[in-house]
Structure formats: structure tokens, C-alpha cells
Amino acid sequence: MPAWPRFMSLRRQYLYKALDKNHQKHPIKHPHTRFLSRLFCALAVLFSYSIYQSFRTDLKQSGSWGCEMSWMSPSYRRLEWTEFISTRYALYLYREQGLDSEDTLSGHPVLFVPGNAGSYQQVRSIASSASKQYYEQVKARERNVVTGKKIDFFTADLKEEFSAFHARTVREQAVFIQHCIKGILQEYTHLPQEKRPTQVTLLAHSMGGVVARLAMDPITSISVDIIVTLSTPHILPPLALERDMDSIYSLIRWRRQHISTHPPLISICGGISDTQIVSDSCALPFFQAGNNSDIAVFTTGIPGVWTAVEHQAIIWCHQIRWRIARMLLDMSSRANTTAKLVTAKEWLLDYQEDETLKEPRSERQHDYSVSSRNMTFIGLHQPSKAFVAQQCNGLERCRTVPSVMSLLPFPNNPSDPFPLPGEGIKPSEVMLVAEISLSSTNTVVKINASQYGQTIAGSREHHLVKGNSWSEFTITMRYRYIRIQLLFCIRPTHTSTFSFYCGTLLTLPRQSWHLSGDISIALMSCTTGVAQKKLLQRTGQICDSVPYGRSCMASRVGCCGSSVSIIRFYQHRSVRTCKGFKLILVGEILSWNSALERIARRRMPICIVLLLLGATIQSQLPDFPMLHTFFLGVNQLEMVPLVGILGVWTFGLLCVVSFHLISTCAIFTTLLIPFKILHVAIWSRNIWTGSAALVSTDNNFYYAIPPALLVKCASCGGTIQKRHVCLKACRIALIILIMSSFSVGARWTWILSPIANAVLILFVASII
């Protein structure tokens, strides 16, 4: 008799008796359970729909983005090294056709590291912009424009591997990057000793930033001056499916804290439009932002960009690639790391004025009467900081008054949404805001401004806002501009419509200078990421700028708004739903009456109470180490009910599995695939690309035990005597899995896989 039919006959023979006893012991005759099941189903559907609609609304209102297309003429030359250790990866030198004609290398080296499934050719956008700007500066030398070194862009071909899903791939790529850094520096041995570069700048996209940081061991870090990452998940991995991936992140944090030669890190994030990398994960941990060397900035906060950017578009978006290329050019001429960081902050955290407009060819001088010691001047359509203010009292000579200047977006069409979709803000659609402080009011202010646009003035008032909401006096009919100053924040970076990093000004631009209307202000908390909207009425020709200071701007919008933060910050929680789907596959999907009879009525209330108790303790101990990684990862007491709601939701996904009814056994032969589907995809791709490192893997044969037990049962017809013991242990393990799937936190998702496999082992053992 064939093995599989014999297994089916054995299964029917031994299971029917157990089923009869089980049904006699636990008859399902509870009418109120039917009502409870329908109520839970309705709540689950309603809650899921609310989350989906909240996310769509938030993404539609705040996630619009606009970028200009970039153009280039790329060419690549593969570098062949006699001592090249890898036959799997390759290294290329980028050259812009028509500009980079020389074959010898004489500039500053920059190595590009692509991300998950990324191509080495993605370097072309930034590299092309750097070449064009360099040769434009060369032509402008007669105009006294400072010219930095030329940039030599190298790019690593990592064969478009799935580094986000496989920790071993990340480690192998990091080793390759270490050897690339050594090889790149050897390419400059033809230069005199004093002109040879001693350090390489790393430019990485997505998971390439994790690879670049992992390559920074004590030896390699000496040869790297700056690491610039684009949309890189620095805090949490995109999918924490392996323990080794968590070990990689722990090693990166340890090296940043303990290696004195570790290069500074500049993290550029795409914001809410980046649906692949969660914005909170792209920010930097508190200990990194507090060292005054690492920088994290969102593209919404970069002057001249003012828009969120999609994950892949951050590479080719012209507004961003132009500033990154210009930043790299200016950094190449700086002698030390401190000066390079100052240059980076000028381009990313504050507007870098156009050198050709420092002294406008023609200026207009205007006199303004002083109405307050604190004055604000706004220059419309003024693309540079060509602004000089002088205080004159009629008796003494006029003296120059220091001013604090910043550029703000000024779209030509007041009815357009912001950020502008399509190509975004044009370079001419900006205005200059200058703030000055005067010694007295009995004077006249003379303004020398650029010939572009017009200049208007007004007084400036300060109001301090404390707590989590704005008081009544802040919502007046007088103000067109609201400027919010973030004085201190728990986290170094946070995202909002216009908020980008701590210690800077958040400016909400007006929509019309002529018509009254409403300004929709969307603020995101740095601790919860929940948006709060408030409408400010504006009328009249008022050009005041009102700073508000507080520790951390506000949040609290209720369940739907909270759902937005949950679904955005825990996008990878869908992995846990997949775990539940695996359990559903191995058993027959029963009615809710049967499922809730065993799980919901008896164990779920106790588990929910424990979850709520743990979330309450978490909210009362916000500074306790590692406590923020559990549950929702937030410390607000009002978020505790969401823990219970999501707990019921999680139970509803996982408790529909039955262990006491006949189910299809054919699915058991593929139990290995659901658990390691990503690794199977990686193996398949490696075979397709002809990789020689197929056996270099860290997979655990523990996951092969369930199908091995099935093979044993089908081949020899053996059974396990104490089936009821395995069945009871399986139910206990399932409860542990349900509790763990909700409470372990986003960082430790890899814990669920071995627990789920233990459930399957016990389940298979109970039916054979």
C-alpha cells in the first residue's frame, strides 16, 4: 500500500475516536457565544476599515510630493583588480559622457552602495549632477566662485540581492564594501603623496546604509570620512525575520558608541511619501543625535526641496540630488571632518545662498518706520539672502543690524496644494524672511534688498505655548504666518507636513496674500507620530511672524488618528498576520462558535487583561530601558485601550484554528515553505544568477522537523501514544504564540518563527 494512502487511513482511524471523546467532553451549545462571535467579527471589520481609511486619508493629504525629472549621460567602467576577493560582486567607476573625459583619477572618491534589490546604476543621478556642477564652477572661476575638488564616483554592483530579508547577505556585502574601500584608495597611488586621498565618502540608499555602517569596523572606519544615507532604516529593520538581523543592528549601535574613529552619519529621509521605510525608523537614536556629529533630516525640511519623496525617487529627484551633489562638492574641499559637517548643515539644515547673488547688481533701498523692537521683513520672490538692514535715528550714522534670515516656499498659484505635486517648488517660487531686533523704536530702518519682488514689514510677537494644545489667544484673525520653534524633543528627528528636525523652525506658508481663508496645520508628535490638525483664520495685510516655543508639539486625535501611526510604524506587523495564516492553513477554518468556545471564552479575557496591565506599566515607566520595544511602542496612557482592541483583533486572527477536526494533510508536506518563503526566494534567485555561495547560509534545520515527522509517519505508519499530551501542549504553545505576536514589539518579530514552528511540531505529533 502506498505511503500516503496508508497515512490517511491511519489518521482517520486514530482521529475519529479522539474526536468523539472531544465532542462529548466539550459540546458546543452556547447561544450567547454566537452573538459574541458576530460582535467580534463586526468590530474586527470596522476597526480594519478605520485603519485603512485613516491611512489613506493621511497619505492623500500629507503624502503628496513633487520632483523635477533628472537627466544624465552615464557610462560605467568596471575595475579589475588582481587581488579581488569576490567573484560574486563587482565595482564600477562612473563617468559622465561629454564631461568626464580623463581616464586618470584625481578627485575625491565617493562609493555608492545600493539597497535591497538595488542596481549599481542608481548612482547616475547624483553623480551626473556633481559632474555638471563641477564643470560649471570651473567655467565660473573668473567670477571668484570657489571650486571644490572633483568627485570620482564608484558604485558597487551587489547583483540586486534581497539584503532586507537575509542577514547573511548583509554581512557578505559589508565585507565586500570593506575591500572596495581599500581598493579605491589604491587607485590613487599614481598621485603625489600629498595629493592622494586618504578617506572615502560613502553614499548609500535604503539597506545599503545598513551595509555601509556594518562595514565600519575599527580598521575600515579610519578610511571613511562621512556616511550619507538616503531612506535607510537605522532604528528597525524592515522585516525582523531573523535573529541575526537584530544582531547586526545591535553591532552597529555598539560600534557607533565605542569606536572613536567611527565616521559621522548623515541620514536623509523621505517622510510620509516613503511607504517602504517607516519614517521613525529612518531617524537616528537619541544617543547618536546628541553627539553633535550625526544629522538626520527629512526632505520636507530641506530648504529648496520642501516635499516628501517616495523611496526610489529620493535617488533621482532633481531638487534633492542637486543639493546632495553640491554638498559633496563643497565637502571635498574641506580639510577636516568638522568643517565637512558644517558644510552639510549649511546645505541640509539651512539655506546656502547663491554665491553670485551675495552682492546684487542693482539694489533698492526702502525706509520703514519702526513699530516694534522686534521686526519681520518678507521679500517676495527673492531667491537669495541678499538682504541688509540698517538702523538710522537721524543724528548718528546708520549702523547695520544683524538679522536672522531663512527662505520659505512662495508658490505662484495660491490655490495649489502644498507640497506641490508634479515638479514641486521652482527655484523662483521662494521668499526671504528676515528677523531683526532693534535697540529702540524711535528710529528708521533702511533695507537694501535684491531687485526681485517686493518687501513688506511688520512687528513680531512671541507667545509661549505649553502642554499639548494651543490656547485660545493663539487662534486670532491677525496672523498669516505661524512659525513654530521646537526647543527640545525626546527624539532627534520627527516628521510632519513641515517639521523635520529638532532645534529648527517650522514655518507654515500662507496660501494667498490677497484672499482670506484657512490654513490647515498638521503637526506630528515626536513620540507617537499621531497627527493633530487645527485651522487658523487669516485676514488683512499682516506680515507678522509669530514664534511659538514648547518642548514637543502636539498630538491627540483619537482612535482613527492613532491607527494611522500604528499602521505606519508597524507596517511589518503584517508578518505576524502571516504567521496566523500559516496556522490557519494547517487546520480547518471552523466557525467562530467553535473557536471562541475554546479560546475566547476561557483564555482570551485573561490574556487581554495581562496585555492591558503590561501596557499600563509601560506608560508609567517611559524611561525604562527596552520597555518601549513592547506592545505599541508608545508611552501615553490614553493609548492603552488600543492595546486591548488590537489584542482582540490578534486573537481573532489566530484562534480560528482547530486541532480536533479532520483537515487536509497535503498541506503538511509544504510546511517548510511558509516559514522560510523569503529564504526560498533568495535561494532561487541565487541559483538563477549563478551565485557560487548557495550553501553559505545560516538556516536552522529545526524548521524541517514537522515535514520530517510526516515523512516518518507516512513511511512506517507509526503513531505517538500520548496524543492528548501533545494536543494540550500544542494549545498552550498557541496561546504563547498569540501573546508573543502582539507583545514582543516590532524589533523582535524573529522570535515568533520558532514559537510557531513549535506549535506545528506539537500539532503534527498530536495527529500522527
UniProtKB/Swiss-Prot annotation:
Membrane topology of the entry: Multi-pass membrane protein
Record EC number: 3.1.-.-
Enzyme kind, highest EC tier: hydrolase
One Gene Ontology MF term: phosphatidylinositol deacylase activity
GO biological process: endoplasmic reticulum to Golgi vesicle-mediated transport; GPI anchor metabolic process; protein transport
Keywords: Endoplasmic reticulum, Glycoprotein, Hydrolase, Membrane, Protein transport, Transmembrane, Transmembrane helix, Transport
Transmembrane domains' residue ranges: 35-55, 604-624, 642-662, 663-683, 700-720, 725-745, 748-768
Listed GO CC annotations: endoplasmic reticulum membrane
Main location: endoplasmic reticulum
General function of this protein: Involved in inositol deacylation of GPI-anchored proteins which plays important roles in the quality control and ER-associated degradation of GPI-anchored proteins.
Protein name as it appears in the record: GPI inositol-deacylase
